[in-house]
Amino acid sequence: MATQVLIAHSGQRLQIDTSRLTTLDEFRSAVSRSTSIPQNCIIALVPPGKALRPQAIQMEKEIFVYDSRMTQTGAPGSPFPVKLEIDLPKPYAITNPPNDIIDTRSLESWQDLFRERRVWAHRLSEDCEGMEKEAHDQYEAMDNMLSCLDAAVANLESVVRATENKYEDLKKWAATEQTGYNDLVTRWEQNLGLARSIPISAAMVRLMTGKDVTGAKGRPSKQATLEDLVDLDCARKEGRRAPTVLRKFNARIADLEKAEGRLMQNFEELEAEFRRVISRSVMGHSQDATQLLQDIQALAGKVENDYRTTMDYSTSTRDLLQASKIAQTHTEKHLPSLHKRALEMDGMLRYAIKARNALALEQAEFMRSIADVSKLDMQVKSLINAIAEDEELATFDYLRLIHQVPYMYAAFTAEAIRRKEWFDKVKTDSTTLANEMALFQDEEAKRRRKWYKTIGDTSYGPESLSTDNNVPGLEVNLLGEDELWPSTSRKDLEEFLDLLQRQRADASIIGDVGKIIAELSNPTKQQFKRLKAFKNGSVHDSALGRSGLMIRGDDELLRSLQDDKTKLETKLRTAESRVRRLEDLLHRQGQASRPTLGNLFQNPSQQLPERSGSAQSVGSPGPIGDRRQSDEVGNQLVQRVAQLEKELQEEKERNAALERDAADRTTHTNDIKAQMDDVNATKKDLLENMEAQKREFLVERKALDEEIRNLKARLEETEDEFHNIDESREHEKTSYDEKVQLLEAQLESLTKEKSDDALKAQGQVDFLRNETRLQRESNEALQAQIQASQDELGLLNKKLKTTNEAADVQLRALRELYTTFVKSAGIPEDVNDLADTVLNNAAETLAKVQNLDADISIMRSNLALAQDVAKDLRAQQANALEKLAKEETTSMHLREQCDEHKAKVNALEGELADGRKQLDELRTQIAQGETGSESLRTRLEEEEKKIVRLTEDLASKQSQVGSLEEELRLFQERLQDSQSKLTTLTLRTETRNERTKDISQRLYSQNERLVRLLERLGFSVSRENGVMTIQKIPRAERSTMNLAASSTADAKSRIASEPADVELLYWMNATDVQGETEKYDKFMSTLGSFDVDAFADTVYRRVKDVEHIARKLQRDVRGYREKTHALHKDAHDKIAFRNFKEGDLALFLPTRNQTNGAWAAFNIGFPHYFLREQEHHRLSNREWLVARITRVQEKVVDLSKSLDTTESINGTSGGAEDDNDNPFDLSDGLRWYLIDAQEDKPGAPSTPGLGKTTVASTKVEAKGDMQTQPRSTPGGLAVLGGAKPSAVDGASKSLSKSLESRRSSTSSTRRPLPFAGALSRNAPGSETNSLRAVATTAPGDGAGSPSGPTSPKPHLAHGEDQDVRLAALPEPQQQRVEVRNDSGGGAIDSLLGPT
């Protein structure tokens, strides 16, 4: 099974197979291969916080690994050698969910929309799943970090606690030692004086010190004292040193206390900080991402299920409406919720990464703190070891020896006494043994001689039998006499104790000497065994010792044995007296219960008459005549007495037998009791012995357990010390390596300085070369500055690119905001959609404003940074130009010097040539033998020296010229490179100026657009003294501002294009730095200033107002929806007369044109709705039809088609009529509608009779008059009973217009009413009303007495070929139609609805 290896600083979890790893180096190598930690920097711990051991590598399940580089202490805030933080991911960019549809009436378009949304939701779910996994990994890394940190703190705690225990032990020892040392320092002279005043035996002094204190001829020169046992010089020396050593010791103890206090304080602070880190842990949020992912997957699954559901839909209108509702639910709830939860998941991921980075930094700081505490712990341990191993404390040992001299003398004296007594006992016992063996030998010899005499002289046996005197004997010799110790006695030791008491020595010394004297009387081990031989109720032979020697002649032992014997005899007598008292008590109890002899065999009833009879015979004197009778009675009495005596004798024998039996039983009982007492006593002794052994075993076991724990603790401490020693060695090795590197660097620097000094010591050429080298270094520094400038330019370009991207993002956001608020495609008809749209737009506006605020601040900071960098570059450019000018001047001087040197060289060459010519001439003259040879030779030598000098000068000048030419060439190359770099920098500066100009223009345009946005939202913006003020415009003034919007925009554009503003926009084109700064400040205070905080607050308040309005509208919409549902429910059974659509209930009546079978829907203002005839309608037998519309087709009459096509279309039936756009012979260009309808309640009678009804809830009474009746209006019905014309007459007139007038009117097109259009989605058929015709019981009810507003009778009619024909009953005179509303309201209002 692989071992889990946790990396502390990164939270990484590795799985390493440790089955083949046997050493720590192999484990470190395996970890180093899997991580970036060097092998020598790996520290391994196991979960209890202990160091990893080689023998436990294969058995550990988890191992914590730390990087020792993280423990290297540095300055606060200094960077760590390892990168701890991980970069935050880019913000998760979510595309808007698909919301575009091509055709709302096409099912395929809806399915495509659902498919795109499903793909979008699936992709979003996968992204969220990845983010959730990454967040889970971060939380797991934090858990691993906390586990490693816990193990490190536990390890530190074990080390610190062990050090604390050592410190406590040392503190206890030091407390007593300090007191003892103080006493020794203050009383050593007093102790020495005491020793001087106490006499001792000179022989003991000789034995203990080897010095002879006696004088010549064996006479003592002085009395030996305890002072002779002490080296006085050494004592005085140590006594003088003792105060200094004591001060040092106290100072070390104080330093140790301070160090230990700092150690414990730092450790407690570290432990408290660790507890705070644990309490602040974010691990409680580790499951939030998982729960959020489950919600996201549930929503994505809902979108998936809805997509599959829509794939099963047909092309029916009902399915289209259902698909539209599902899409609307997605748009309002599911997709925004997915979008919001995805952003929450991204936020959770970023939160987890930030928490992980913060924990990594805290963990690294903890490791540094742990390293500091460990170093302090090592300091405390070193102080403890230094105190414990201090060699100067030997001073106090010698002073303590002075204090303990009486005890040492008493100990040696007691030892001498023991040895003398032991030797005397050995001699006595050996002599006694030899004497006893001699007696045994003599007795054996006598027995043999006597035996030989008894058997007589026989021939049996060996020949030497008669003279056999060789009896085995025993010879005792003492070997190896002990060294000669002085002869002392107990009396001498007791006198020494008395002397100490008189001298008022230390009480502890007196007590120790008294203990020594008392221990002299203690028996030996064998003697103690004999004394304790009686154990557990019996005497054990093994407890008597191996021999009977070494106890004879011991008076003390005999006295102790006699005391034990006396005690045992006393116990025996006490037990015997107790037994006698018990026997006496038992005997008395037996006598009290025994019967008397007189009444032994008689009952009391028998004894009383006899006694009374005898009394009467004795007391009453009988007559003489009665003597015979009395004699007979007397004989009987004699016989009776004899018989009673005989029975008495038998009873005595029987009683004696019973007494003997009782005595035997009593004896037996006593024996049994005695045995029971012995058994109980034995048992008691055994139990006590076992209890004693148990207590001894428990004490011994506790002692052994304590010793085992101490040994284990010492073992762990030793291992920790070994581990710390290894770490300290590694740290020391690292520090030594650093010191070696530092020394090497210093050595190299010294070597370089030495070489520089040697180079400086050269001549002029070397000096010029050094100058050239310095100039070259300056050029290299300039090149480095240019390279740094290029790097800064690259960074600035990156920042500029980032700024441009941010500006583009802001521009796009502003355009979208402008499009959303100003150029909207249209206002939604539903109030819910309107409220949701306003809320969404407001939320998006606020979010974009906040992003824009951050981007503007970043852009401003980047702009300021770019300005600073541009200034620095200009300064660097000026410095570079100055350096180039200086270099050109230097090069010109060098050229001049080079020319001068060349001229000098030419002159020297000319002089050299002249000298050579003169030399040649002189040589020729000498050769010719001219006079004056000596002067010529002198001249020749001078000329030769001059030539040599000129030659040397020429060589030096040539070398100088060569070096100068080389330097000139290098300067020219440097100059060319600097000029090219200067050109590049100039181009980049110009490019940066252009980009800065672009940024300024964009900043200005963005500020202007934000101002326009505020004005669009109904606010006015004003600036005074650099402060922007936003005020809300009253609603009354907004209309005038909207009317003047275009003119205001033109004015603003003109104002923005003023020369002053243009000049401020191009502030970077200023000629000098001061002018540029002034223009920039003016630009930032006027055009570039925009209070984003005020803008955000204004938009926020506006959003809150919109939310308040939206909530109010939602409450209104909720009420309207309830009313709509109620109206829809109420209108479901009412007949519609306008806005015909699918699901409405319509009344169809036959038109005048009966040839084509045209049936039209009864309507007001909505003509040309014709019924498609079906077989089940049975229209031939009907006068009217109430049916529910299932389909409405819009058609336009086109008479331009051929006649053949028209006839073929008219000749078809059913589906062929769908292609004929004029089946009812309508006018050309007329828009009409073909309706498919199903009868609402099939089975109604085709021709209802009088008093009958076709609809259960409708009562109709009609009377027709076939005679010609005058009409009040053309095309209308006569009003019966002389009633006044009602408001329906006007409707009848308008419906009876000619075809041409209707075609020219606007009523032939379908235009939705405003109110109906607003509620058409949620309340279909809301404007339909019920049409109910109530039959009257009398003909004159409705004609003669109209009841209020319900009495008027309308004349129902419609346009050309669609005049209404009421179904008439067979009454010949007239027909009368009365329409009433069951609810009691106006009949015409219920029929027509709100107008």
Curated annotation (Swiss-Prot):
Region (Disordered) location: 586-632, 647-673, 1260-1395
Database matches in SUPFAM superfamilies: Tropomyosin
Coiled-coil stretches: 123-172, 246-277, 555-591, 629-818, 862-986
Compartments where found: Preautophagosomal structure membrane; Vacuole membrane
Comp. bias (Polar residues): 590-619
InterPro entries on file: ATG11, Atg11_C, ATG17-like_dom
Keyword Protein biosynthesis: no
Main localization, broad class: membrane
Protein transport as UniProt keyword: yes
Keywords: Autophagy, Coiled coil, Membrane, Protein transport, Transport, Vacuole
Cleavable signal peptide: none
Gene Ontology CC terms: Atg1/ULK1 kinase complex; phagophore assembly site membrane; vacuolar membrane
Any one GO MF annotation of this record: molecular adaptor activity
GO BP, one annotated term: ribophagy
Membrane topology listed for this record: Peripheral membrane protein
Compositional bias per record (Low complexity), positions renumbered to this chain: 1292-1311, 1337-1350
Pfam families: ATG11, ATG17_like
Binding partners and assembly: Homodimer.
Protein family: Belongs to the ATG11 family.
Function (record text): Involved in cytoplasm to vacuole transport (Cvt), pexophagy, mitophagy and nucleophagy. Recruits mitochondria for their selective degradation via autophagy (mitophagy) during starvation. Works as scaffold proteins that recruit ATG proteins to the pre-autophagosome (PAS), the site of vesicle/autophagosome formation. Required for the Cvt vesicles completion.
Official protein name in the record: Autophagy-related protein 11
